[in-house]
Amino acid sequence: MSENPNPAPAATPSLTLAVTTTGANPLAFDPPSLEAPANTVIQVDYLNDSPVPHNINFFAGADSSAESLGKTTVETGPGATESVIFRTPAAPGDYYFWCDVHGAAMSGMLHVH
């Protein structure tokens, strides 16, 4: 596991979610959307099980122009794993995530409620 470039929040995560990229569909997150409560520290475990380099970057808005909430480093699979810990936004809504390597071609939504 690589060192996360974003420091973790001081709190322990109260929810852990998992996201995978597989060799069968190397330009997609599985699942393509996640759900979490507002203003909650979460951990997202990312498994890159494809041979293509990827990461996952969560944004504080509906697209990549917003500030990053947290991201993993770029990992080359198969079998590379890394976790990112961050606090979800206080406002309910849909928040964008993507792979920094592939941009909008590989993205998803974090539904905060």
Model regions: which residues?
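Beta-strand signatures of extracellular beta-sandwich domains
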Residues: 55-59
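Beta-strand cores of secreted/periplasmic/IMS beta-sandwich domains, seen most often
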Residues: 32-52, 82-90, 111-112
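Surface loop/turn signatures of beta-propeller and other carbohydrate-active proteins
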Residues: 71-75
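Short beta-strand and strand-turn-strand segments in soluble, beta-rich domains
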Residues: 26, 63-70
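N-terminal edge beta-strand
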Residues: 10-41
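Solvent-exposed coil/turn segments that connect beta secondary-structure elements
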Residues: 22, 49-51, 61-62, 102-104
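Extracellular/periplasmic metallocenter environments
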Residues: 4-5, 9, 13, 76-113
